[in-house]
Amino acid sequence: MKQYLELIQKVLDEGTQKNDRTGTGTLSIFGHQMRFNLLEGFPLVTTKRCHLRSIIHELLWFLQGDTNIAYLHENNVTIWDEWADENGDLGPVYGKQWRAWPTPDGRHIDQIATVLSQLKNDPDSRRIIVSAWNVGELDKMALAPCHAFFQFYVADGKLSCQLYQRSCDVFLGLPFNIASYALLVHMMAQQCDLDVGDFVWTGGDTHLYSNHMEQTHLQLSREPRALPKLVIKRKPDSLFDYRFDDFEIEGYDPHPGIKAPVAI
């Protein structure tokens, strides 16, 4: 994950001090890209321990179209708690947009099912895209989508994906986002009988919060370790039938975790 540490250093060296919605303050750059060859290992940050349970369960939750944190709580995942209302609802966030984007005539579009069909039946299409940025429903969401738009690409029997992330918390959020989308590419590839290719991450407002600086410097002082390997133990009947126990990360030997406050 050398690219990730290089990004941290770039933000520290070149970032502009900016105010933000949370009132915390950031160092920010605009426009950055990283590419991860998924055949070379699973891109999980090793300079601090990442909470795999949260990463996997959150993705499974998205794929079910769920927008209430009850499922997450049942599985000891609390990463969405700060934004949920008293009933655990988040409004029409990622899961709703991925699986049931509303149309003006009252129908709903399952973008994930559509993408799966395209990958199987028209893999050379340049329209294999999922968007969570529904302008008509942004004001109903507890949090506007940060990872907003992603596109799949098939070449030489390999599946690649590029994500555009309009806002990126480099220290806390980005390691989760990279691992989550890498996991999704592996799952999609298995369902479509493809190998994995590259995951390309593109960031818009890419920032370090002012109250993450001590943690950031600690992380930069650590030497990256070898990337782990993702093992998917079975091939379910559909993308929507994966379970937490289907995934195993082999050889993950990270440095200790580093706690930092979440900007809300």
Curated annotation (Swiss-Prot):
Gene3D superfamilies: Thymidylate synthase/dCMP hydroxymethylase domain. It catalyses: dUMP + (6R)-5,10-methylene-5,6,7,8-tetrahydrofolate = 7,8-dihydrofolate + dTMP. Pathway: Pyrimidine metabolism; dTTP biosynthesis. It comes from the Bacteria. Its EC number is 2.1.1.45. (6R)-5,10-methylene-5,6,7,8-tetrahydrofolate binds at H51, D169, A263. GO terms for cellular component: cytosol. It is an enzyme of class 2 (transferase). PROSITE patterns: THYMIDYLATE_SYNTHASE. It is found in: Cytoplasm. CDD domains: TS_Pyrimidine_HMase. GO terms for biological process: dTMP biosynthetic process; dTTP biosynthetic process; methylation. GO terms for molecular function: thymidylate synthase activity. Homodimer. Belongs to the thymidylate synthase family. Bacterial-type ThyA subfamily. NCBIfam families: PRK01827.1-3, PRK01827.1-5, thym_sym. This is Thymidylate synthase. It comes from Salmonella typhi. The gene is thyA.
